[in-house]
């Protein structure tokens, strides 16, 4: 007995979602309702800038894919959701959706995501978004390492000036 083309299309979509989740470093998703086309376009442009891929899937198909991979996201998969897949780093997807949810509070509701292979809820998603990026963390580290050296240098300079006087 042959499978219907609709059933085959659904299997292909589930396979696509499974591949996207497997290859993504992190995922975040939010419920969106009432957004204008211009607002969605703005979100997609912003996503492209930060290396995040946005997709809209049926919740049931997304649930089938996440169940295959061992993620229990079923309680969050209600309403019209937009899924953000971050392939470059662990925080871009969360940062994008948190930023957009703040800007459009009445239209976007953060749901959940994955971070370091674990399911995270809305509160944890916000915490992930607040973390500095890799480059920002390196800058903070460099500054904190330079401060004591600068103070030592200044102290030695003052001591040498006092001895010369």
From Swiss-Prot:
GO cellular component, one term: ribosome
Subunit structure: Part of the ribosomal stalk of the 50S ribosomal subunit. The N-terminus interacts with L11 and the large rRNA to form the base of the stalk. The C-terminus forms an elongated spine to which L12 dimers bind in a sequential fashion forming a multimeric L10(L12)X complex.
BP-aspect Gene Ontology terms: translation
Organism: Mycoplasmopsis synoviae (strain 53) (Mycoplasma synoviae)
Keywords: Ribonucleoprotein, Ribosomal protein, RNA-binding, rRNA-binding
PANTHER family: 39S RIBOSOMAL PROTEIN L10, MITOCHONDRIAL
Protein name as catalogued: Large ribosomal subunit protein uL10
Family note: Belongs to the universal ribosomal protein uL10 family.
Function: Forms part of the ribosomal stalk, playing a central role in the interaction of the ribosome with GTP-bound translation factors.
MF term (GO), any: large ribosomal subunit rRNA binding
């Amino acid at each position: 007995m042959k499978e219907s083309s609709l059933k085959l299309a659904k299997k292909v979509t589930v396979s696509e979602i499974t591949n996207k989740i497997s290859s993504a470093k992190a995922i975040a998703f939010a419920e969106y309702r009432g957004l204008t086309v211009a607002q969605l376009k703005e979100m997609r442009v912003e996503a492209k800038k930060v290396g995040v891929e946005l997709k809209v899937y049926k919740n049931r198909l997304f649930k089938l894919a996440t169940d295959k991979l061992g993620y229990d996201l079923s309680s969050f998969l209600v309403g019209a959701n937009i899924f953000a897949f971050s392939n470059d780093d662990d925080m871009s997807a969360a940062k994008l959706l948190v930023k957009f949810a703040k800007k459009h509070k009445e239209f976007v509701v953060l749901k959940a995501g994955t971070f370091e292979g674990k399911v995270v809820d809305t509160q944890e998603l916000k915490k992930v978004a607040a973390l500095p990026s890799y480059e920002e963390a390196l800058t903070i580290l460099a500054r904190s390492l330079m401060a004591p050296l600068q103070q030592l240098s200044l102290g030695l300079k003052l001591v040498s000036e006092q001895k010369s006087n």
